[in-house]
């Protein structure tokens, strides 16, 4: 029986939206209550009886720490892990990618079952992690929580066999017949270590490539689809507009 930990990457600069605050704190007003968008994925993780969550931030994200604090107000313990900028040369700093953010808290995630979700997403039902975790049986190493999308060109689309075992991930395909995208992930320590090895020893820093390498190496992925589930992310102004329209419904 492994310990559980949540993992929420929130280290990106979020420059596309140009908000004067971290996009993870974009205000969602529901039933006359304010909740930042990142509160939703935290709730999803806590619903699955996970009481320790690692949030990956960059050195400018003080407001996230101010909002979430140590987690006690949100029924969990929160550890903040700072992902530092890589200096490629003296004049140009590049933000490390998502895969590197997923690996940054390795010292906290190794040896545990990881519940991973993005800080700028709203996913329904609220207990989807709890439901999906029931499929994490002894012969399955990774669970992909899957949702329908009308924009596969922005998503990681999932190829399945008849038993919902994942054959590969097609990342952001221009055209596809695939029905499901992955929106959040649960994984066992075997995948944490594989992921860490890809980043540090194999120089593979694209998460879709790492997923596919893992599948090829025999790590067993299973898809759990939420037929009536909802997945909304906040990558662009169009997404913000969709979120507003969805909340009105």
Question: Can you describe what each PLM-predicted range is?
Answer:
Residues 25, 158-160, 223:
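A structural signal for short hydrophobic beta-strand segments in well-ordered beta-sheet cores
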Residues 37-41, 97-104, 210:
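Well-ordered alpha-helical segments embedded in enzymatic catalytic cores
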Residues 42-43, 61-64, 69, 125-137, ...:
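Short alpha-helix within the catalytic core of nucleotide-sugar-dependent glycosyltransferases
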Residues 58, 81-83, 145, 169, ...:
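Conserved beta-strand termini and adjacent loop/short-helix elements that scaffold enzyme active sites
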Residues 73-162:
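Conserved beta-loop-beta/alpha segment of the NTase-like Rossmann-fold superfamily
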Residues 115, 133, 165-249:
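Catalytic-core segments of class I nucleotidyltransferases/pyrophosphorylases
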